[in-house]
Swiss-Prot record:
<feature type="transmembrane region" description="Helical">
    <location>
        <begin position="84"/>
        <end position="108"/>
    </location>
</feature>
<feature type="transmembrane region" description="Helical">
    <location>
        <begin position="462"/>
        <end position="486"/>
    </location>
</feature>
<keyword id="KW-0812">Transmembrane</keyword>
<comment type="function">
    <text>One of the components of the core complex of photosystem II (PSII). It binds chlorophyll and helps catalyze the primary light-induced photochemical processes of PSII. PSII is a light-driven water:plastoquinone oxidoreductase, using light energy to abstract electrons from H(2)O, generating O(2) and a proton gradient subsequently used for ATP formation.</text>
</comment>
<dbReference type="GO" id="GO:0016168">
    <property type="term" value="F:chlorophyll binding"/>
</dbReference>
<keyword id="KW-0604">Photosystem II</keyword>
<dbReference type="Pfam" id="PF00421">
    <property type="entry name" value="PSII"/>
</dbReference>
<dbReference type="InterPro" id="IPR005869">
    <property type="entry name" value="PSII_PsbC"/>
</dbReference>
<dbReference type="GO" id="GO:0009772">
    <property type="term" value="P:photosynthetic electron transport in photosystem II"/>
</dbReference>
<keyword id="KW-1133">Transmembrane helix</keyword>
<keyword id="KW-0479">Metal-binding</keyword>
<keyword id="KW-0793">Thylakoid</keyword>
<feature type="transmembrane region" description="Helical">
    <location>
        <begin position="193"/>
        <end position="215"/>
    </location>
</feature>
<keyword id="KW-0157">Chromophore</keyword>
<dbReference type="GO" id="GO:0045156">
    <property type="term" value="F:electron transporter, transferring electrons within the cyclic electron transport pathway of photosynthesis activity"/>
</dbReference>
<dbReference type="GO" id="GO:0009523">
    <property type="term" value="C:photosystem II"/>
</dbReference>
<feature type="transmembrane region" description="Helical">
    <location>
        <begin position="270"/>
        <end position="290"/>
    </location>
</feature>
Length: 488
């Protein structure tokens, strides 16, 4: 065996190691050397330890770019891989919401591979989307590795357009403007898909939903901004109350215009004096602003997916809570009406209508426990309404088989648990081995939105403290561990 000369390694082996597998490479150990700075990313030069992640890259824009591009690659890789995973596990005979999918429902909502009634007839578009994302992730991954390991540490000298100084207020608002333009283009991509490229899935299309072109989007600002100015409480529902594709696509037209116009404004102008005074201008401050914005998006998405069955069709995501409840009342009404019950006059145990009743304002609504969800609007029940709530003549003569099937399916796939509850408390899920994608998406976005908000507060506090000249973090000069001997 060739003898390796390395100071002290033989002594260490003799005293501490007994296994050959442990001895074999002991002489090539690389102890932590605080005198060697790794590209300006060690604790001495940056003030941040390795676990602070991108904080070490605050002043090395090239490496920070690499970290962000690599992160984008990871996200896109997950998207592609998970889409292919869902395609591989897809069972045509089962609804999407019974298969635990969260990506194919989004693609189906965009009108790809789906037909009348929300039936998936072609999974090839989903395969293509997955593969395109995988290829994109490889490109992003290579870019991330290049900028992290090979590219210039800073961009300011080599590529001035992409370089920046966190305190350069004009450059920061220019970057903000570029982001806004890109977001506006993203909003218009949905508009283009809905108007020109195959259309989108509309759960309100006659007969139980279908893919259609949205040829006449709502552009009336009173309608679009009326959603924004609505109360978020009760039946008003803020923007979450959008209930037709014309308003939804029209909203994207307005958002696209506003984002692009705002982006151009921020690119061409410099911040006003009041803005320069009002905001903190540092990397950590921008991080806190971003986290706050993401928090709002996450919490809004959480409410949207839970309550809205237009942007998130129940054919793909499963019914909303009120929808499953009303579906149960409707299913038993259909059953008992066939058995001869007079659904208009039958009384329940409380003396109120068992199947149908009047609301305080006189509307005919479903009776029983589901009365609390009287204001539900869903595609399978709307054809049965008249000028004053449910139409008794339609209930007796016009119920279609597709409405019965859909209600029975939704009844047994409630997002929160059994609707055969006691005192309004959900007892157990009403189906076997089932968790609604609405529940998954709602709770995940709620948690993410909450913790992003906590991150916003944390980084905003640190940024404000730094701007005011306070000490960031805790003074650790007197911690006992600093006076202890090294482990080895």
């Amino acid at each position: 065996m060739t003898k390796v000369f390395a100071l002290g390694w033989l002594l260490k082996i003799n005293l501490m190691k007994t296994l050959y597998s442990l001895r074999r490479f002991y002489h090539v150990e690389t102890p932590f050397n605080t005198t060697v700075g790794v590209g300006g990313r060690d604790i001495e030069s940056t003030g941040f330890a390795w676990w602070s992640g991108n904080a070490r890259l605050i002043n090395v824009s090239g490496k920070l770019l690499g970290a962000h591009v690599a992160h984008a690659g990871i996200m896109v890789f997950w998207t592609g891989a998970m889409t292919l995973f869902e395609v591989a596990h897809f069972v045509p005979e089962k609804p999407l919401y019974e298969q635990g999918f969260i990506l194919i429902p989004h693609l189906a909502t965009l009108g790809w591979g789906v037909g009348p009634g929300g039936e998936i007839f072609n999974t090839y578009p989903y395969f293509v989307v997955g593969v395109v994302h995988l290829i994109s992730s490889a490109v992003l991954g290579f870019g991330g590795l290049y900028h992290s390991l090979i590219g210039p540490d800073t961009l300011e000298e080599s590529f001035p357009f992409f370089g920046y100084d966190w305190r350069d207020k004009n450059k920061m608002t220019t970057i903000l403007g570029i982001h806004l333009v890109l977001l506006g283009i993203g909003a218009f991509l949905l508009v283009i898909k809905a108007l020109f490229i195959g259309g989108v899935y509309d759960t309100w299309a006659p007969g139980g939903g279908d893919v259609r072109f949205v040829s006449n989007p709502t552009l009336n600002p009173l309608v679009i901004f009326g959603y924004v100015l609505k109360s978020p409480f009760g039946g008003d529902g803020w923007i979450v109350s959008v209930n037709n594709m014309e308003d939804l696509v029209g909203g994207h037209v307005w958002i696209g215009i506003i984002c692009i116009a705002g982006g151009i404004w921020h690119i061409l102008t410099k911040p006003f004096a009041w803005a320069r005074r009002a905001f903190v201008w540092s990397g950590e401050a921008y991080l806190s602003y971003s986290l706050g914005a993401l928090s709002i998006m996450g919490l809004t998405a959480s409410n949207f997916v839970w309550y809205n069955n237009t942007a998130y069709p129940s054919e793909f995501y499963g019914p909303t809570g009120p929808e499953a409840s009303q579906a149960q009342a409707f299913t038993f009404l259909v059953r008992d009406q066939r058995l001869g019950a007079n659904v208009a006059s039958s009384q329940g145990p409380t003396g109120l209508g068992k199947y149908l009743m009047r609301s305080p304002s006189g509307e005919i609504i479903f009776g029983g426990e589901t009365m609390r969800f009287w204001d539900l609007r869903a595609p399978w029940v709307e054809p049965l309404r008249g000028p004053n709530g449910l139409d008794l003549n339609k209930i007796k003569n016009d119920i279609q088989p597709w409405q019965e099937r859909r209600a029975a399916e939704y009844m047994t796939h409630a997002p929160l648990g059994s609707l055969n509850s006691v005192g309004g408390v959900a007892t157990e899920i009403n189906s076997v081995n089932y968790v609604s994608p609405r529940s998954w998406l709602t709770t995940s976005h709620s948690f993410l939105g909450f913790f992003l908000f906590i991150g916003h507060l944390w980084h905003a506090g640190r940024a404000r403290a730094a701007a005011a000249g306070f000490e960031k973090g805790i003074n650790r000069e007197n911690e006992p561990v600093l006076s202890m001997r090294p482990l080895d």
